[in-house]
Amino acid sequence: MDDDSLQKEFVHRVLEAYRKTPGTMGTIRRPDRLLAQQLYQRGVSATTVENAFVRAAARRLMRSTDAPPLGTIRSLAYFLPVIDEVLGLSVSQDYFQHLRQKLQRFPSTR
């Protein structure tokens, strides 16, 4: 597969995961697509980005019930600090699988 095809596949995978992440608007805008392309060019793996979505969504959903509600995530850029955080982690994929299972217990926020 050529690099163009690989980038398109990466962008599609990342944007589809972003669209389905709890707490997001569920829509994709041009800046989101451009940022996904930049992440590909940086060499960030799609799995890393998906893990960042899971980590951020888990944090948002597993907050105290007394905490004020959070606004809707409107941009892929919201996740950049979490992507960088995930890049620096040295944890097993089991950790992210555990978070995914916890997220499945929460009702959809969209």
Model region roles, listed by residue range:
Residues 2-110:
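Intrinsically disordered, low-complexity, basic-enriched segments
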